Amino acid sequence: MWFFGSKGASGFSSRSTAEEVTHGVDGTGLTAIVTGASSGIGVETARVLSLRGVHVVMAVRNTDSGAKVKEDIVKQVPGAKLDVMELDLSSMQSVRKFASEYKSTGLPLNLLINNAGIMACPFMLSKDNIELQFATNHLGHFLLTKLLLDTMKSTSRESKREGRIVNLSSEAHRFSYPEGVRFDKINDKSSYSSMRAYGQSKLCNVLHANELTKQLKEDGVNITANSLHPGAIMTNLGRYFNPYLAVAVGAVAKYILKSVPQGAATTCYVALNPQVAGVSGEYFQDSNIAKPLPLVKDTELAKKVWDFSTKLTDSQSGESSS
């Protein structure tokens, strides 16, 4: 679909930009957290949300880089409301610190955009001794969402506006390990595959959004949760790629890769476009609903990932699982 740029049911395509899919949308009064907002499509996401009047909190590992991005955005969007806060998703302590500091500001939270990620890195463990891609791409966002969910619920009730949780997944979710999620081998270095581990983390992003949808509906809360594939974009997400592969991809990039404004489009569409009102538990691509791997519709697997993630995050805090 992206290669030909054909429009889907939404009226948008792989060639649509973040500005185009949010044209005419007024986000005044909304507050959003965007993780990984200091690089790649996270920057464009923060910029376009700001352009539409959203107060954006940039959750970034490097606050100096975040401050520079904020400065650049303000130059382009005078009057933009942006804050920079430190967040290292590979560290549960950092996630808890961020959530605590965010709640202490008293800010509402309408939109949570779980954008940050790493891709295809060599085998490494996080500060909590969990395989780094699983820890950063899935577990950090799982914990962040859990800690901020009450704030989102109260914001939705008080503002009478729909809250939206957006998980950036990838088409790589189709290429996880054969067993899908390696619950008993998350830290198995001997059989580690950098790309399959990435796919596993992206599969969990979709399953997380789907289980969230189920729980939010049961609670009767006006909050949606969706996942998406932003498209193939040449950003520093792939900084661990083999250099020869990077050169080969670069040679054909202009024919097959999205620009950053195009890459941020689906995120901004799912976060702001009124067409998505009330839509939850879906997987989007090119600003349209798409079909994910059938495995992600496995509700038992989604619950198992949820329980597994809860156990891992609770074990680092001394809490008991529930």
Swiss-Prot record:
Major localisation: plastid
Localization per record: Plastid, Chloroplast inner membrane
Binding of NADP(+), residues: G36, A37, S38, S39, G40, I41, G42, D88, L89, N115, T136
Tissue spec. comment: Expressed in leaves and roots.
Biological process annotations from GO: protein transport
InterPro entries from the UniProt entry: NAD(P)-bd_dom_sf, SDR_fam, TIC32
EC class (word): oxidoreductase
A Pfam family per the record: adh_short
Cellular compartments per GO CC: chloroplast; chloroplast envelope; chloroplast inner membrane; cytosol; plasma membrane
The keyword Membrane is annotated on this UniProt entry: yes
Keyword annotations of the record: Chloroplast, Membrane, Oxidoreductase, Plastid, Plastid inner membrane, Protein transport, Transport
SUPFAM superfamilies per record: NAD(P)-binding Rossmann-fold domains
Active site: Y192
Binding site for substrate: S170
EC number: 1.1.1.-
Region (Interaction with calmodulin): 298-314
GO molecular function terms listed in the Swiss-Prot or TrEMBL record: oxidoreductase activity
Name of the protein in its database record: Short-chain dehydrogenase TIC 32, chloroplastic
Organism of provenance: Arabidopsis thaliana
